[in-house]
């Protein structure tokens, strides 16, 4: 049985990896071995950060809500508890958006939360 060298397959595989490594710095874009390692690591970073992004946005929304609530003499936790007691079911993304874009509506929600806490 003759030996198969697989030159075409190897070249295609290497081209595919080097194409994915386009834009990397230094030898990580030109040398196959380091490019392959970096492509694998980049995939791990991407996987991790897709999950991290959700946590980061939630933290951002909470920070914005807290800042807006403190302008109305209320802490974030008391505001959220007051909204829950008042039966107002609004998520943090929408509440953060209201705090930035529509201050009057946010002030009404804060006053309802304060009433519910009394």
Curated annotation (Swiss-Prot):
Which InterPro entries does this one have?
Answer: Ribosomal_bL20 (IPR005813), RIBOSOMAL_L20_CS (IPR049946), Ribosomal_protein_bL20_C (IPR035566)
Looking up Gene3D superfamilies in the UniProt record yields: 6.10.160.10, Ribosomal protein L20
Biological process annotations from GO: ribosomal large subunit assembly; translation
Gene Ontology cellular-component terms listed:
ribonucleoprotein complex; ribosome
Top-level taxon of origin: Bacteria
Q: Name one GO molecular function term.
A: rRNA binding
Q: Which PROSITE patterns match?
A: RIBOSOMAL_L20
- Pfam families named in the record: Ribosomal_L20
Q: Which UniProt keywords apply?
A: Ribonucleoprotein, Ribosomal protein, RNA-binding, rRNA-binding
The entry assigns this protein to a family as follows: Belongs to the bacterial ribosomal protein bL20 family.
- Write out the function statement from the record: Binds directly to 23S ribosomal RNA and is necessary for the in vitro assembly process of the 50S ribosomal subunit. It is not involved in the protein synthesizing functions of that subunit.
What is the protein name given in its UniProt record?
Answer: Large ribosomal subunit protein bL20
What is the species of this protein?
Oceanobacillus iheyensis (strain DSM 14371 / CIP 107618 / JCM 11309 / KCTC 3954 / HTE831)
Upper classification of the source organism reads:
Bacteria, Bacillati, Bacillota, Bacilli, Bacillales
